Amino acid sequence: MVTRVVLQQADISRALTRISHEILESNRGIDGLAILGIPTRGVVLARRIAESIQRIEQEAVGASADIVGALDVTMYRDDLARNPTRAPQPTSLPGPIDGKTVVLVDDVLFSGRTIRAALDALSDLGRPRAVRLAVLVDRGHRELPIRADFVGKNLPSAASERIFVRFAEVDGQDAVTIEEGGA
C-alpha cells in the first residue's frame, strides 16, 4: 500500500476558514443557522467550522450563538445489513431546527449515501428552511444525486483508493491521506 499526504494541518485550516466565510456569506450571518456534524469526524469538523464562524462574526458584529450539534445517521443507513457499522451515537441539536438553515457537515463525500441518511434523520427532527452540505473532501463517485455546497478540496480518486481524514481531536494529528490499492 502506498500512502500519500494530500492535505496537512495548514491546508485543512485554510480550507475550514474559507468554508466558514462561504457559509456566512450564503446565510448572511449566523441568525437562523445550525451546523450539524455527522459522527465521527464530521462532528469534529462541524465544531471547528462553528468556532471559526463565531470568531469571524465576533470580530465583524460582536455576535455569538450556540449553532453546532451532531446528527447520528446510523439507523437511517441503507447498508446496515451488508455493512454493520459502529454503535449509534447521540444526536444533539443546538435548538429547534424548524425554519433554520441547517448545514450538514461530513469529512468525505463519496457515494452520497451517508448524506441521504442524514436527510432522512433530519426530516424526523423538524422542517428546516434550507439544508446545505459542507465537506472537507469531495472525492466523486456519487451513486445518488447529491452535491456539496461548501467543499474544502475536490479530490478525484480511483474507486480502489481510500481517503482518510485525521483530526488531532480523534487521531492525534490533522491530515488527509490517500491510500492506493485499498478496496
From Swiss-Prot:
Show the catalytic activity: UMP + diphosphate = 5-phospho-alpha-D-ribose 1-diphosphate + uracil
Top-level taxon in the UniProt lineage: Bacteria
What is the recorded name of this protein? Bifunctional protein PyrR
Q: What does this protein do?
A: Regulates the transcription of the pyrimidine nucleotide (pyr) operon in response to exogenous pyrimidines.
One GO biological process term is: regulation of DNA-templated transcription
Q: Where is this motif: PRPP-binding?
A: 102-114
Name the Pfam families for this protein. Answer: Pribosyltran (PF00156)
Keyword Magnesium part of the UniProt annotation: no
UniProt GO molecular function: uracil phosphoribosyltransferase activity
**UniProt keyword annotations, A-Z:** Glycosyltransferase, Transcription, Transcription regulation, Transferase
Q: What is its EC number?
A: 2.4.2.9
The family database entries (InterPro entries) matched by this protein are listed as:
PRibTrfase_dom, PRTase-like, PyrR, PyrR_bifunctional
In terms of SUPFAM superfamilies, this protein maps to: PRTase-like
Family indicated by similarity: Belongs to the purine/pyrimidine phosphoribosyltransferase family. PyrR subfamily.
Task: List the PANTHER family hit by this protein, alphabetically.
Answer: BIFUNCTIONAL PROTEIN PYRR
